[in-house]
């Protein structure tokens, strides 16, 4: 396995400026993404955490999920008052979801290893599974390659009426439907020496799981059995039981948090920074979980009542405090308060985030301060593109630059290739013929114009019909060229499908199953063990 660093520019100005440590953006963060360790450690050493309670809660989850010994050992290190953590997180995607979920795990593991060696204290890699999310449409599918070099969405047909209403962890886990979905995915795989083993692994993990979050966790543990990755489900009752005090703080400071977030978002947008986050002064940034209505986002109305959008529920602040104390499992965080809850629970040395997370965390600094917290340093996750040998040979065959193809695709190169093969200059000839026809036809249009509007319109339609026939011939001629070079066109399309599928990065579309099918179940562990990847870089992995 050969690795090559690659520089790819992001289109998000905020993220670019953050990576460049630009002062115009860094004012929205408490730390730089580099050289933050000593300052952050000093801060963490002055805080206390419910370490024993947290380890006990996660230990229950690990035992349920059959966590490997290495993960158990790492988890137990958090009891040490000196121990800190590197944290990342993601939704519970099927078979982990897109590749970038795996890349986050790799980033967390590698950064934890680096910092433990550098600082000489235990640094625990923690991956936070967002089981409280309810948007099932974001996790219920993957993409598979088709014979015409396209990526097709394969969606899990979950029939539950709760899909999209209840949190993913609470959603009915329809194993039969998921088995059908798994078979559909494996039908798209080319048979290799690893296919049967991977299929058996997935079926075993599926049969032993009782929720989508557990399916995700068990799968990740299989991919990283020796790396000590600690997994937790943010919606697990075991975790909720130690969050009561933190929910009470968020309830108390609701107005301040809401106003601070809205003010910062407005400021960011005024500075023309793109951030896909909206907030209103009345937003509570907490969810309530109702058996009938599912997960509902709470707001605070002008009378100080905590209500849902449709006003089906109404709570006084005292009633909500009582829920936090007696039934914390009925509450959960949204995208605004989840980072703060994470900070309350875990002594976080650094948070590993993608571009979207860096963008929305930029709105949270003042809210953190309201809860007497400092935002953790945010380290951009590592990004990868995998290139198989055949695709690599195609790049060489057509003398294409991989960075350019990843960034902009192959369409311009494919068009130039076909233009070079078009020795008869079909398009140029067609345009000349159309111009000549229009000139020859003009006397007829002039005569028609003198006879009235109806006959004038008829003459113009007549010209249009003739030119359309010429266009039809142009298409047929170009199609003949495409037939002649169908193999080459297919090769261009393959490079696009592999390197820039659906007009985006490979890691946002492809599932890790395809990389495992090429190189084995341990391919990602091999990457972590045998290679050091610089943070903030994109890397090419030559398979």
From Swiss-Prot:
InterPro entries, A to Z: Bacillithiol_biosynth_BshC, CC_BshC, Rossmann-like_BshC
The source's domain of life comes to Bacteria
Query: Does Nucleotide-binding show up as a keyword for this record?
Result: no
> What does the UniProt keyword field contain?
Coiled coil, Ligase
Q: Give the residue range of the signal peptide.
A: none
The record's EC number reads 6.-.-.-
User: Molecular function terms in GO for this entry?
Assistant: ligase activity
Positions in coiled-coil regions: 419-440
Function according to Swiss-Prot or TrEMBL? Involved in bacillithiol (BSH) biosynthesis. May catalyze the last step of the pathway, the addition of cysteine to glucosamine malate (GlcN-Mal) to generate BSH.
Task: Identify its protein family.
Answer: Belongs to the BshC family.
Which protein are we looking at?
A: Putative cysteine ligase BshC
Query: What's the source species for this entry?
Result: Oceanobacillus iheyensis (strain DSM 14371 / CIP 107618 / JCM 11309 / KCTC 3954 / HTE831)
């Amino acid at each position: 396995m050969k690795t090559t660093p690659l520089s790819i520019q992001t289109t998000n100005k905020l993220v670019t400026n953050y990576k460049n440590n630009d002062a115009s953006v860094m004012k929205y963060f408490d730390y730089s993404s580099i050289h933050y360790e000593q300052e952050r450690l000093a801060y963490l050493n002055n805080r206390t955490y419910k370490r024993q309670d947290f380890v006990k809660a996660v230990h229950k989850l690990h035992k349920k999920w059959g966590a490997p010994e290495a993960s158990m050992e790492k988890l137990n290190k958090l009891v040490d008052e000196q121990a800190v953590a590197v944290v990342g997180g993601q939704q519970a995607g099927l078979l982990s979801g897109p590749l970038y979920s795996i890349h986050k795990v790799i980033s967390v593991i590698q950064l934890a290893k680096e910092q433990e060696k550098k600082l000489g204290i235990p640094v625990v890699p923690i991956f936070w599974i967002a089981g409280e999310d309810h948007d099932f449409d974001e996790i219920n599918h993957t993409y598979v390659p088709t014979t015409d070099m396209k990526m097709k969405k394969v969606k899990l047909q979950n029939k539950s009426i709760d899909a999209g209403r209840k949190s993913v962890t609470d959603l009915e886990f329809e194993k039969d439907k998921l088995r059908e979905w798994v078979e559909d995915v494996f039908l798209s795989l080319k048979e290799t020496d690893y296919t049967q083993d991977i299929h058996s692994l997935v079926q075993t993990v599926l049969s032993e799981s009782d929720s989508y979050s557990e399916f995700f966790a068990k799968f990740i543990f299989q991919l990283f059995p020796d790396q000590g990755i600690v997994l937790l489900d943010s919606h697990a009752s075991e975790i909720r039981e130690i969050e009561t005090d933190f929910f009470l703080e968020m309830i108390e400071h609701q107005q301040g948090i809401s106003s601070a977030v809205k003010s910062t978002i407005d400021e960011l947008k005024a500075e023309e920074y793109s951030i896909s986050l909206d907030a209103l002064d009345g937003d509570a940034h907490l969810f309530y979980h109702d058996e009938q209505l599912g997960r509902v986002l709470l707001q605070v109305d002008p009378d100080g009542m905590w209500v849902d959008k449709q006003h089906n529920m109404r709570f006084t602040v005292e009633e909500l405090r009582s829920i936090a104390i007696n039934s914390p499992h009925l509450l959960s965080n949204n995208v605004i308060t989840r980072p703060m809850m994470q900070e309350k629970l875990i002594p976080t040395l650094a948070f590993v985030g993608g571009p979207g997370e860096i963008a929305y965390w930029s709105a949270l600094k003042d809210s953190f301060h309201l809860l007497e917290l400092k935002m953790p340093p945010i380290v951009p996750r590592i990004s990868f593109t995998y290139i198989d040998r055949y695709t690599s040979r195609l790049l060489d065959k057509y003398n294409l630059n991989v960075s350019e193809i990843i960034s902009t695709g192959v369409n311009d190169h494919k068009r130039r290739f076909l233009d070079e093969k078009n020795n008869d200059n079909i398009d140029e000839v067609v345009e000349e013929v159309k111009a000549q026809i229009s000139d020859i036809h003009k006397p007829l249009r002039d005569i028609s114009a003198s006879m009235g509007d109806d006959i004038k319109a008829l003459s113009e339609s007549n010209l249009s019909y003739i030119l359309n026939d010429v266009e039809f011939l142009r298409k047929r001629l170009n199609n003949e060229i495409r037939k002649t070079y169908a193999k080459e066109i297919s090769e261009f399309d393959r490079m696009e499908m592999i390197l820039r599928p659906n007009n985006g990065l490979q890691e946002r579309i492809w599932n890790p199953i395809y990389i495992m099918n090429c190189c084995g179940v341990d391919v990602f562990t091999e990457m972590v063990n045998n290679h050091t990847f610089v943070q903030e870089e994109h890397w090419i992995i030559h398979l």
